[in-house]
């Protein structure tokens, strides 16, 4: 219900909404984005967040799930929040400082999960166990 309300209220500001029909549309959508505020209580490893970060989208994440390991332990506590007030404050700060956050490349956080790198690692590990 809240998403339906947001879609109506922010209709003039929304460029893309919902499921993207192709991977290229999805990637284009990520590259057009600046901020990804996440409120989920469940996330499988944070893959969608890593995809967004790889496309230079600024994440605002709950200090739980895999995000703590992916960001806080890497020194990026500014991307994590612990309550709704912090979430709102961090979103407001990101919007007010949008030019600065666009220059804050966190891509290096996501690069170690790039498939071009991981495929070789997986191939090597699979080869070890099949010998």
Language-model segment annotations:
Residues 2-21:
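Nucleotide-activated donor-binding/catalytic signature segment of Leloir-type glycosyltransferases, i.e.
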Residues 20-23, 84:
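Structural motif corresponding to alpha-helix initiation and N-cap regions
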Residues 27, 45, 50-54, 68-69:
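Short alpha-helical segment that forms part of, or immediately flanks, the ligand-binding pocket
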Residues 27-33:
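Short alpha-helical donor nucleotide-sugar binding micro-motif in glycosyltransferases
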Residues 41:
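Aromatic "clamp/platform" in nucleotide-sugar-dependent glycosyltransferases that forms part
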Residues 58-61:
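Short hydrophobic beta-strand element within catalytic cores of glycosyltransferases
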Residues 96-130:
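A charged, aromatic-enriched C-terminal amphipathic alpha-helix characteristic of glycosyltransferases
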